[in-house]
Amino acid sequence: MEQVVIVDAIRTPMGRSKGGAFRNVRAEDLSAHLMRSLLARNPALEAAALDDIYWGCVQQTLEQGFNIARNAALLAEVPHSVPAVTVNRLCGSSMQALHDAARMIMTGDAQACLVGGVEHMGHVPMSHGVDFHPGLSRNVAKAAGMMGLTAEMLARMHGISREMQDAFAARSHARAWAATQSGAFKNEIIPTGGHDADGVLKQFNYDEVIRPETTMEALATLRPAFDPVSGTVTAGSSSALSDGAAAMLVMSESRARELGLKPRARVRSMAVVGCDPSIMGYGPVPASKLALKKAGLSASDIGVFEMNEAFAAQILPCIKDLGLMEQIDEKINLNGGAIALGHPLGCSGARISTTLLNLMERKDVQFGLATMCIGLGQGIATVFERV
């Protein structure tokens, strides 16, 4: 079986969804920009030699509809002979895109693929056109489709207080801002055209979603966003709404070395698991455990974790049940997470994997794990190994 390696990984800055940097930039353009950039950064690989493009996107309608993967590839002037497919596993879409490409390479059906994902939540809101079947309420709680209420449920089940959530949210912004100031994101962010507050076209090379002024005291003044009577989850402890894209160049190790391209990491194992939709945010726990089992590793072997921060109330129970509460500041989301950077649904899997690879290199660790919860009760995880 072929070894699957990540040769390169990049992302756009994360733009605010409401009147942000990418308010006049379409999702296809964000995607095409990264496709072009990956190919330009790795000229040893001819675009025509790509076997496929796998691109995650959740709200596949309006500008994100009709197979955005192919539309973006055409905009990027990728040769017409290269196919492209859009992948949807809700929040896990671009990580699923990575898994799909990895399996193709493992079986010898592909040698080189572009993978990634995008979501423009400003142009195509998360709730646009959603129409759940009324019969679902016979099988799952009605609130299972309301992500904020599932986070409230997890907080109550695991004893996660409002103060714990606010502290974690403040940490996310502080870590992300520190990473920005130190240049830690420089190796992953590709400057991307957008418009500033005055409408002037400029190149953005930073995440505008981060709020460096965030404090626990300020967060404590916010009202519950989903359960106004007894809730603890606020907008401040939830992932921000943002627009962005992320992309990776994935190859067989033999082809990468043949072309003189240096692999950054191997895909050591992959896992996807279902869970009760009412606690959809718990999915990273069984998914991570399965991925670790497949890799022949334990949580203690992992040097760095990237866990998508859908809600502080959601990620903290996952950290607790993976036995990592005492190692948060040493191993988990060291550059902040989605509470500060946002969670553009179809982009986030590739985004956290990209950030993870850079952290693994900076910290000089052998193994890293990226994982995320998925709406309606799933979890997805990937174990990476430095080459």
UniProtKB/Swiss-Prot annotation:
- Reaction catalysed by this enzyme: an acyl-CoA + acetyl-CoA = a 3-oxoacyl-CoA + CoA
Name the Gene3D superfamilies on file.
Answer: 3.40.47.10
State its location(s): Cytoplasm
SUPFAM superfamilies in alphabetical order: Thiolase-like
Checking InterPro entries in the record gives:
FadA, Thiolase, Thiolase-like, Thiolase-like_sf_Thiolase, Thiolase_acyl_enz_int_AS, Thiolase_AS, Thiolase_C, Thiolase_CS
Q: Which GO terms describe its biological process?
A: fatty acid beta-oxidation; phenylacetate catabolic process
- Output the superkingdom of the source species: Bacteria
Catalytic site positions: 91 (acyl-thioester intermediate), 343 (proton acceptor), 373 (proton acceptor)
| Keyword terms, alphabetized | Acyltransferase, Cytoplasm, Fatty acid metabolism, Lipid degradation, Lipid metabolism, Transferase
This entry carries the following GO cellular component terms, namely:
cytoplasm
Q: What's the Enzyme Commission number for this chain?
A: 2.3.1.16
Q: Name one Pfam family in it.
A: Thiolase_C
Enzyme class, UniProt record, top EC level: transferase
GO MF annotations in UniProt: acetyl-CoA C-acyltransferase activity
Q: What metabolic or biological pathway is this protein involved in?
A: Lipid metabolism; fatty acid beta-oxidation
Principal localization reads: cytoplasm
Please verify whether the record's keywords include Acyltransferase: yes
- Partners and quaternary state? Heterotetramer of two alpha chains (FadB) and two beta chains (FadA).
Q: What does this protein do?
A: Catalyzes the final step of fatty acid oxidation in which acetyl-CoA is released and the CoA ester of a fatty acid two carbons shorter is formed.
Concerning its family, UniProt says: Belongs to the thiolase-like superfamily. Thiolase family.
Protein name as annotated: 3-ketoacyl-CoA thiolase
Q: Which organism is it from?
A: Escherichia fergusonii (strain ATCC 35469 / DSM 13698 / CCUG 18766 / IAM 14443 / JCM 21226 / LMG 7866 / NBRC 102419 / NCTC 12128 / CDC 0568-73)
